[in-house]
């Protein structure tokens, strides 16, 4: 399955919520009519079945983190095999992706831009270049922008934007050095309350 490269507003309208696919310079409501479904007429959504609700939640989370269907299924299997709550394990695995950590640290204004930085070898982990967006970052790892990319305007602007919106507590960043530490894997209470991971667990349990 190919990665979606079309309009981001279309995805937000499909899920009826902000997927944080845009930079956040303007409120999502001023850019996308997320109350209306995709299409010219933007019909209002009808009542969904339980399955439809579960599927939409999975698609929402998958799109937030920019993960393909097969990848997401793999993350779920890994989460189910670990101790603890499967839904929480799933979100933690997604949060530990390198492209997501780069986004959380503010080196990229969106997860898509952060993924591109990783793929273009602009990011290092513990001093070693890593170009795999799905690389799992561990507590204590140092994630940094490589010297060759430090002066990129988009990185400078992303850091400024992150300073405005605020940075999550589980990363510590030196904006001048463009380097940060992934302090710990976030607890479920640290993550978005707008995600209902139990619906995803119910979907995969069928």
Swiss-Prot record:
Residues 96-156 form the S4 RNA-binding domain. InterPro entries: Ribosomal_uS4 (IPR022801), Ribosomal_uS4_bac-type (IPR005709), Ribosomal_uS4_CS (IPR018079), Ribosomal_uS4_N (IPR001912), S4_RNA-bd (IPR002942), S4_RNA-bd_sf (IPR036986). One of its GO terms (biological process) is ribosomal small subunit biogenesis. SMART domains: Ribosomal_S4 (SM01390), S4 (SM00363). GO terms for molecular function: rRNA binding; structural constituent of ribosome. GO terms for cellular component: small ribosomal subunit. Keywords: Ribonucleoprotein, Ribosomal protein, RNA-binding, rRNA-binding. Gene3D superfamilies: Ribosomal Protein S4 Delta 41, Chain A, domain 1, RNA-binding S4 domain. Belongs to the universal ribosomal protein uS4 family. One of the primary rRNA binding proteins, it binds directly to 16S rRNA where it nucleates assembly of the body of the 30S subunit. With S5 and S12 plays an important role in translational accuracy. Part of the 30S ribosomal subunit. Contacts protein S5. The interaction surface between S4 and S5 is involved in control of translational fidelity. NCBIfam families: PRK05327.1, rpsD_bact. This is Small ribosomal subunit protein uS4. It comes from Pseudomonas fluorescens (strain Pf0-1).
